[in-house]
Amino acid sequence: MKIRRATSEDLQQLYAFNHRMYPERLNYKEIIDFWIAKSPEAINDIIVVADDDGKIKGQQLFSSMSYYRDGVEVDGTWAFDLIVDEELRAGSQGFSLMWKCKKEHPHTMSSGSNDISMAINMKIGNKHIGDLKKFVGIANPLWLLTSVFRGSVPSNKFPQVLKTKGAIYQKIEHLENIPQIKESYNLQLLEYSRKLDFITWRFFSGLHDYALYKRDLSDDYFVVRTIVRNHVTSLVLVDYRCRLSDESNMDKIICAFKSLASKLKLGVLIVGSSVALVDSVCMRYHFKAVGRDRPILGMISCEDSDRVRETRNFILLTLADTDGEVTW
């Protein structure tokens, strides 16, 4: 067995391995293509376990993503989909894969590890620096019935303008109107970059049908799409950027988000939050935290990870930064 970086010659094997390991992902090819389309070198970020015949037996997927800390940009990666073949799980291949990944990608973060994986990650140097909570709210009880058996709502059915609480948001239809965010939005937080190349790849590459709304006279924005689970259509706040030093900025985004759901006659709303201020705004609008908090792990220096995790004022993470929303 060899643990190495993937190449373009491994693509068909990656398809086959992911189809076998994640049978519930009917669009597994599209998901892999989405990640490796980010850059010409993207497939080389992936670490695989391969036998002597080149058949893939394990993987850890990575996506290059830069982040800001204290206003300084750091090149890093996002890690996800760590899995090895059943026949290797009794041995040391899983740990060896994780150790190889640490050496190849020293500035990486991830979320959602189970208890066993998290314990191993902590032993090899990861810090538990936060948790991503999923909040669920109701836009209007009257729209719950109209959300059943409705299917996805295409973004071309979304309104062009949202007016709410002293703010106006315009839906962005053309790439030249995408916000030009070239630096950290919130200096007090570790925050992933939202440069033009990220926004273009993440929301305009066609994997899912997103709508991006930008606030007038500002680069504040939020991104939404609909998902269908158990025949119920929900509206998801996938991404957002605003100055979190002023709670009213996030309040305007949540208010506009709820207004959009009402215009679309959708009852269920979903928001991801890793920051106490966002938690507070969501709860003020009667959102409830549901499910298991997804631990955020990082190969970074952090003097008191217990404190920053408890205060939830260290890292800004949205559903767009994680791999989970991509598979919804």
Give the positions of each predicted feature.
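Conserved acetyl-CoA binding element of GNAT-fold acetyltransferases
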Residues: 73-86, 232-244
